């Protein structure tokens, strides 16, 4: 089986995963993070050729007169998954990484609707809707979370690339965490003895921008503070391909039944650390490189 790939995007042509009924087409929603209308060559960009995303545009429909209820992380995702205006929920604002889940688990959501229609549902990538009840122990199963929102499977990051905790969460459990080195997160103060981007610039491989003076993970300064969980920390360069592999596995595993996948790209949100094979490829610096990583030339993975 061949799976089409657009940089870090999935191509899912009709029938490639065996749609069993025309009335139940497979559905994949891809939501990029901080990608502008003018960043794509199918909408007129010339500096970077986003041929992968262009293929989706050319083989489908383009919304040239469309509107969104919000254009930032948490509010846009809240609105997409609940059908609610984000201003109807005071908590639907850009959240810290340790925020509580802001979606009422008793409310109908898009994945719940899909599941009730016979779909298996999955979420891969950026989450940023809060987790738990606001007092999360990251070393224990996290409840409520993506499952309670309506996803049968999830492999997510809690918030954004630049916010702690810098770990992956699969089906409500921190990936790679050990009782010998538990993870702690705080958004008010640092943990004693832990280096930060503000106080230890010599440990950084990029200059900290405003607000990014917190914990250092993978040589990158973050928002907020975390301690421990060293073996579970992500390497920014590997995030795109790992999310892709998890998404592909979900589609392959469920190819004989209708599926719904929410695929939250983490690109091109800061800190913009592309995989080594994309560094310098765009000629437009790190932001251009991660756009190319996420929406650039189509490749094929067997």
What feature does the model see in each segment?
Residues 4-5, 10, 16-302:
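Formylglycine-dependent sulfatase
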């Amino acid at each position: 089986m061949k799976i089409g790939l657009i940089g870090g995007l999935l191509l899912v042509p009709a029938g490639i995963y065996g749609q069993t009924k025309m009335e139940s087409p497979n559905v994949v929603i891809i939501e990029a993070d901080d990608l502008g209308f003018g960043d794509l060559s199918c909408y007129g960009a010339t500096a970077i050729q986003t041929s992968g995303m262009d293929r989706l545009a050319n083989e489908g429909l383009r919304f040239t007169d469309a509107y969104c209820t919000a254009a930032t992380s948490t509010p846009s995702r809240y609105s997409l998954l609940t059908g609610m205006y984000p201003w109807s929920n005071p908590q639907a604002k850009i959240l810290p990484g340790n925020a509580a889940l802001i979606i009422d688990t008793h409310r109908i959501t898009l994945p719940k609707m899909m599941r009730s229609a016979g779909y298996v549902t999955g979420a891969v990538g950026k989450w940023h809707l809060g987790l738990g009840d606001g007092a999360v122990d990251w070393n224990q199963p996290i409840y409520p979370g993506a499952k309670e929102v309506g996803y049968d499977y999830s492999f997510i990051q809690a918030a954004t690339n630049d916010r702690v905790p810098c770990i992956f969460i699969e089906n409500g459990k921190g990936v790679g965490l050990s009782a010998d080195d538990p993870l702690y997160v705080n958004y008010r103060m640092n943990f004693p003895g832990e280096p930060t981007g503000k106080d230890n610039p010599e440990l950084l491989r990029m200059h900290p921008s405003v607000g990014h003076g917190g914990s250092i993970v993978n040589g990158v300064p973050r928002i907020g503070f975390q301690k421990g969980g060293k073996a579970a920390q992500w390497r920014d360069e590997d995030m795109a391909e790992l999310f892709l592999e998890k998404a592909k596995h979900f589609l392959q595993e469920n190819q004989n039944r209708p599926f719904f996948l929410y695929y939250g790209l983490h690109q091109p949100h800061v800190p913009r650390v592309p995989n080594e094979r994309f560094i310098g490829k765009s000629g437009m610096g790190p932001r251009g490189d991660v756009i190319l990583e996420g929406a650039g030339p189509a490749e094929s993975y067997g």
